[in-house]
């Protein structure tokens, strides 16, 4: 029941339903999600105790079972068998969208392999909530989950992500936040723009923005923060092409087309000015003794 409205428990087709749940504020759930949870034969939960709070809040009484990283090998086949037997299964995580930093992808893969329909029921997502409030570029982003605990492995992972032309999104624990931010400064550079989302959608929600170095300094000096944390790091700035690289590009293009068109194409590819590139190409051709090719 939502307010005075009874949630209809309409029969569901046999399928695996991936139901997004609130990341903090229990009001952040869709009507479709509630209808699905109210009608599913089985609700598979990361932690049944955590999920019971949500289900009780909306008066949903359905059979629940645990499905998490430590029992996936045993619980997965049982859920597949239930699906093959004509039952509907709703998969939920403790918070947010299933499969985002949890083992649900294994169950989805098994369902697909067995020809079972998989239905996404979209809704809350902590990485997307943080990204949209960060002020960082959102046209391209990469969710990297939790960084490794060991220092060496953490730096190796960050080095691998250094040149990715997208906003990076991480989950982090409060006790490791300061250390991880320090590693990001070392591996990614301290001047990158970043944002820290903490306790998103909850009473003490906080979004703190600044450079990586400023944020690292802040959390190194502050008490250990509380709550769930999402770290967003802006993409690396595109480096200007080296003059030698531009020269090689101009000569390569000029070998296939007139100089004016080569300069025009080079301008499109590098963001440079066509006239300046044209003059540079003529200089290169004069030096090589080729003269003006038009």
UniProtKB/Swiss-Prot annotation:
Q: Where in the cell is it found?
A: Cytoplasm
User: Under the GO molecular function aspect, what terms does this record hold?
Assistant: rRNA (cytosine-2'-O-)-methyltransferase activity
Transmembrane annotation, as ranges: none
Under Pfam families, the record lists: RsmI_C, TP_methylase
Q: Which reaction does it catalyse?
A: cytidine(1402) in 16S rRNA + S-adenosyl-L-methionine = 2'-O-methylcytidine(1402) in 16S rRNA + S-adenosyl-L-homocysteine + H(+)
Q: Record's superkingdom?
A: Bacteria
UniProt-listed CDD domains = RsmI
Where is this chain primarily localised? cytoplasm
Q: What class of enzyme is it?
A: transferase
Which InterPro entries does its entry note? 4pyrrol_Mease, 4pyrrol_Methylase_sf, 4pyrrole_Mease_sub1, 4pyrrole_Mease_sub2, rRNA_ssu_MeTfrase_I, RsmI_HTH, SAM_MeTrfase_RsmI_CS
Which UniProt keywords are given for this protein, alphabetically ordered? Cytoplasm, Methyltransferase, rRNA processing, S-adenosyl-L-methionine, Transferase
A GO CC term?
cytoplasm
EC nos: 2.1.1.198
User: What family classification does the UniProt entry report for this protein?
Assistant: Belongs to the methyltransferase superfamily. RsmI family.
Q: What does this protein do?
A: Catalyzes the 2'-O-methylation of the ribose of cytidine 1402 (C1402) in 16S rRNA.
In Swiss-Prot or TrEMBL terms, this protein is called Ribosomal RNA small subunit methyltransferase I
The organism of origin for this protein: Mesorhizobium japonicum (strain LMG 29417 / CECT 9101 / MAFF 303099) (Mesorhizobium loti (strain MAFF 303099))
Encoding gene, per UniProt annotation: rsmI
